């Protein structure tokens, strides 16, 4: 059931100059035309529109926003390559943010991909791809253009995967969710972060967000391609 916002509580604020993202106190929401839950999230009504709660315990991008992410390269008409789409929890919110854009959602495991397919059937801007993100040449033909890459992959070679896709698609900006324990389970997380920053020296590092307490030893890194001016 939808609930009305009580304006006397926390003041609602649109984020990044877009009405598709709303913050009320410590809660995030994305505007949706579907009025349908994806993963059991709450739906509220605000300014004659429906908004789905975007939970930071279920989405690392939501966690980064609540932790103070200053820049949002994803706009209403952006084309996004999402690596590690899983069942589509965060993908669904990116779909809300970019209603006139495209989300190319890559997932290698069939079980979560089947749920991603169900989501894509309900949303015209999600293009699911059952493929290995290690091999971008296999899905290059399917992707017309990429403005932003978002990667959330639990593999030891996640940095190599990121750089391979950056080279293949040449986006202006990209998010890398760094999962340090997937790279080395015993090495200090900050040491892994430092080494990762060194490996990303060919890009402009714009922000590094520690995702704790939502995700321990996880970081979200936002980069721009060299030469991109803001």
Swiss-Prot record:
Gene coding for it: flpA
Keyword RNA-binding: yes
Its biological purpose: Involved in pre-rRNA and tRNA processing. Utilizes the methyl donor S-adenosyl-L-methionine to catalyze the site-specific 2'-hydroxyl methylation of ribose moieties in rRNA and tRNA. Site specificity is provided by a guide RNA that base pairs with the substrate. Methylation occurs at a characteristic distance from the sequence involved in base pairing with the guide RNA.
NCBIfam families linked to this entry: PRK04266.1-2
HAMAP family linked: RNA_methyltransf_FlpA
Top-rank EC class of the record's enzyme: transferase
Species per Swiss-Prot/TrEMBL record: Thermoplasma acidophilum (strain ATCC 25905 / DSM 1728 / JCM 9062 / NBRC 15155 / AMRC-C165)
InterPro entries: Fibrillarin (IPR000692), Fibrillarin_CS (IPR020813), SAM-dependent_MTases_sf (IPR029063)
Xref: Pfam families: Fibrillarin
EC assignment: 2.1.1.-
GO biological process: box C/D sno(s)RNA 3'-end processing; tRNA processing
Subunit: Interacts with nop5. Component of box C/D small ribonucleoprotein (sRNP) particles that contain rpl7ae, FlpA and nop5, plus a guide RNA.
Family: Belongs to the methyltransferase superfamily. Fibrillarin family.
Binding site for S-adenosyl-L-methionine: 89-90, 107-108, 132-133, 152-155
Keyword check for RNA-binding: yes
Entry protein name: Fibrillarin-like rRNA/tRNA 2'-O-methyltransferase
Any one GO molecular function term: rRNA methyltransferase activity
Taxonomic superkingdom: Archaea
Keyword entries, A-Z: Methyltransferase, RNA-binding, rRNA processing, Transferase, tRNA processing
